[in-house]
C-alpha cells in the first residue's frame, strides 16, 4: 500500500509462503510493478510461522532477506509489536518483536478514528475487528494506545484476541463437527474437501473468481464448483443435493464463525474497566459481512455500550481495507519517519 492518500494504491496478492518462500522477492517485485513513486519501504509481516521455516527466528530472517533482495536495506523500516521501527538487521536480531506485527500496526493506526477525550483520563475506548482469509483479530484500543499486553500470537490466542478462522482458507471439518442434512445432523468427513471460501461463494458474500484455482479440489473459485466441494464434506456430490441442502451447510458454517466472533468480542470487551465503555467498533478486512451478522441483533451494542460502527471499507475503499495492515504501516511510516 502507498502512503499517499491521493494515490489510492493498494494491492493484495496471494502467496503460499509454506510452498514457495524462496520466491517471495519475485512476488514483491511483481506487486510493486505499477506502484506510485516511493522513497522508503515500511514492512510489517506475517507468515514467519509457516512450517517451511524451522523456527520463528528463521522465518523472520528469511522474510527480511527476501525483502532486501528487492529493496535496499537502508530504505527498509520494520514495524515491531512495541510500536517502534527497526532496520532489517536489528529486526533479525530480535525476531520475536518483529514477528506477526501486522495486527499491532493496524490497531495503532486505527486509534485515529476514536474521538479526542473531552475530560482528562477519560479517553475514548474502541475495539478493532479485522477479518481476513485465515484469521480474525479482535483488539481493544484507546486514543492513547493499543490496550493489550499481548506480544505474540500465542498470547493473543489465549486472550481470545486472535481467532484462527477466516472467510476463505479455513478447513470446514476443523470448524464444525456436523451440519444439517435432510432433517438430521450429519457429521463432516475429516478431509480437505471444502473451505470457508466455498460457503461464502455459495451464500453470495464472496465474488466468484473463475481464474483462481487455489481451492480444495484445484477447480475454479465459482459458486457452482463450491456447490460440489460443499457436498463432498457430507459424502454427497453437487448433483445429489438440492440448493436448500447446500444453503443449510453454508449457513451452518457462517453461524459457527459468528458464534466464535461473538465469544471473542464478549471476552475482549469484558476486560474494559467498569467505569469505561467501548464506544466504537472498527471493522477492516474483506470479511466485514461476518461482523455485520454478529452485531445484527444489537445485543452486543446494548450490553457493552457500543455507539458507533466504523467500516474502513467505506472510509478507505475496498482495496485499502483488504490490505489494511499494509496501508496502516505506510501511514505510520509517513507520519513518524523521515521517509
Regions found by a protein language model. Give the residues of each.
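Nucleotide/phosphate-binding catalytic cleft detector across ATP-hydrolyzing
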Residues: 3-128, 139-339
